[in-house]
Regions:
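N-terminal regulatory/effector-sensing and dimerization cores
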Residues: 26-131
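Histidine (H) residue identity feature
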Residues: 7, 16, 67, 107-110, ...
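Generic structural signal of hydrophobic/aromatic residues within well-ordered alpha-helices
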Residues: 11-14, 21, 36, 121
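Short, Lys/Arg-enriched, Trp-marked, Pro/Gly-tolerant hinge/linker segments that flank
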Residues: 128-141
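Feature targets compositionally biased, intrinsically disordered low-complexity regions
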Residues: 4-7, 30, 75, 137-139
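OB/S1-fold single-stranded nucleic-acid-binding modules
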Residues: 1-19, 26
Length: 141
């Protein structure tokens, strides 16, 4: 069975890291794991990042280092080549198997948030379920 989520050994494989990054994993009220992981590699192994198992979850990624001309992929195809700027946050929908070509040093803080965790927060707050979040790569906030 494929491991879901974006933390631990899985993120090590995806980003071709030498060491497994530490992750803070929290369990939401509905028993869903939410994780925060810092990744950094000053001398990365070049190549396309590993395959993400499609799931109904999001990665909120705060970029801590510039990454110019980032070749971004979805569903096995290059879809954009934006300049990533430190201090900018990006949202990735894991249903679209996001990936990128690793060819430069990188440093990011990733938050793995399953859609069911967002639904639980909405339910607990008496709000409508979130549904689909609009993830337009290359447009940070």
């Amino acid at each position: 069975m494929a491991q879901s989520g974006f933390h631990g050994e899985k993120i090590k494989e995806l980003l071709h890291l030498r060491d497994t990054p530490s992750s803070l994993i929290m369990r939401s009220v509905r028993g869903v794991n939410v994780a925060a992981t810092e990744t950094r590699d000053d001398n990365p192994v070049p190549g396309l990042s590993g395959r993400i198992v499609p799931e109904d979850a999001y990665i909120v990624s705060l970029k801590l280092r510039d990454y110019p001309d980032c070749e971004y992929w979805e569903n096995g195809k290059c879809v954009a080549k934006p300049d990533i700027r430190a201090g900018t946050t990006y949202l990735y929908d894991m249903k679209y198997e996001p990936g990128f070509v690793i060819e430069k040093p990188f440093h990011s803080l990733h938050f793995y948030v399953p859609a069911s965790a967002l639904d639980g927060i909405a339910e607990q707050s008496g709000a409508r379920r979130v549904g689909q979040l609009d993830c337009q790569y290359g447009t940070g906030f």
